[in-house]
Amino acid sequence: VDAMKQYAPGMGKVPVLSEFGVYNHNTQFVRGIGHAVYIANEMIDYIGFGTPYINKHCLVDYPYGADNLGSGSQCVIQAIKQNDGTTDFVSTPSAKMFSIFNNMTGTTQIGQKIEGNVTCYTYKGYNVPLVKAISSKDEQGNIYLTVVNNSRDERTDVNLIIDGKDLTGKDL
């Protein structure tokens, strides 16, 4: 965001992200789930930067014009041609991820601290943490916490402590 401000100083421009990266794998199922987890990680980062997310690389994949990773790998909606020539549409894991962020977050981001968060893996010199999270609250004071476990193979236990609240939402 700061780097963008130098190109349009004082103009009130807000950078908008128009594409999310692609997670490649041999099987479409793992690739679809992996891509959704990747999107969750990126969205947490972008929200932290104060940058809106509005678009996706490929909204709909049609069987006759699928992206180069194959049907359903990169799109939000997969089109499926039926035997009678009509087309049906189904949500992908990426669509579910957008739904979680659009419907299960509050309007105000609140602070959080993750202790003991180890590196899950390293990609091109960038350390990917085992857990990534974002916390927010709405106008009624409801608290939302979205946690992403970046390990495909390991279960990750998370202990939550919310200042001044128990997990039923009652004040302490």
Residue ranges and their predicted role:
Residues 124-169:
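Carbohydrate-binding surface patches
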Residues 1-25:
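Glycoside hydrolase catalytic-domain groove-lining segments
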Residues 10-14, 49-54, 140-142:
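Loop/turn elements at helix/coil->beta-strand transitions in domains of secreted/extracellular proteins
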Residues 17, 21-131:
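Aromatic/acidic polysaccharide-binding cleft in carbohydrate-active enzymes
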Residues 1-3, 90-100, 131-147:
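Extended, compositionally biased low-complexity polar/Lys-Gly-rich tracts
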Residues 4-11, 48-50, 166-168:
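Secondary-structure transition/capping motifs at alpha-helix termini
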